[in-house]
Amino acid sequence: MDQREAETLQYYLKEYGQQAEVFANQLELMENGRMEALAAIEALQSLVEGGDGTVLLQIGGGASLRAKIVEPDKVLLNIGSDVIVEKPNAAAVEYLKDRITELEASQKKVAEALDKLRNQMNEIAKRLEQGYAQAQAAAGGSHAGHAHAHGEDEDEE
C-alpha cells in the first residue's frame, strides 16, 4: 500500500466516522421522541381513567405548577410544521401510537445504515492495519534478517 492509498483510506475512515456520529445522534433523537410519545400516552390514559384531573405543569427552569385539566378529552397535537390539531383523547392516543410505530421503523432503518457504515469502517481499518504491517515488515526486513544471521552464527559456535 502506498502513501496515497493510506491517506485516502484514512480520509474515508474519518468521513464515515462523522456519518456514524450523525446516525447515532439521529437514533438518540428518535428514541427521545419515542419515549416522549409513550409518556404522553400514559398521561392521556391516566386522565381518562379517573382522578380529579390535577397534573403537574412544568413551566421551565425546574419549576412546576399544579394545574387542573378542564377538558381531558380535548387534546391539542402538534402534527408537524407547527400545525396544531384538536383530537379526542382516544384519537390522540392512537395518533401517538402510530407515531411510535413510524419512529421504530425509522430507528430500524437508521440502525441498519449505521451497522453497514461501521462494517465498512472496520474493513477500512483492517486494510490500513495490513498496509502498515506490510510497510513495517518491508522496512524492518533487512534488520530482522541481520539479527537472525547473528543468532545463527552464535548457535554454530
Labelled PLM ranges:
Residues M1-I79, V83-E157:
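Intrinsically disordered, low-complexity regulatory regions in eukaryotic proteins
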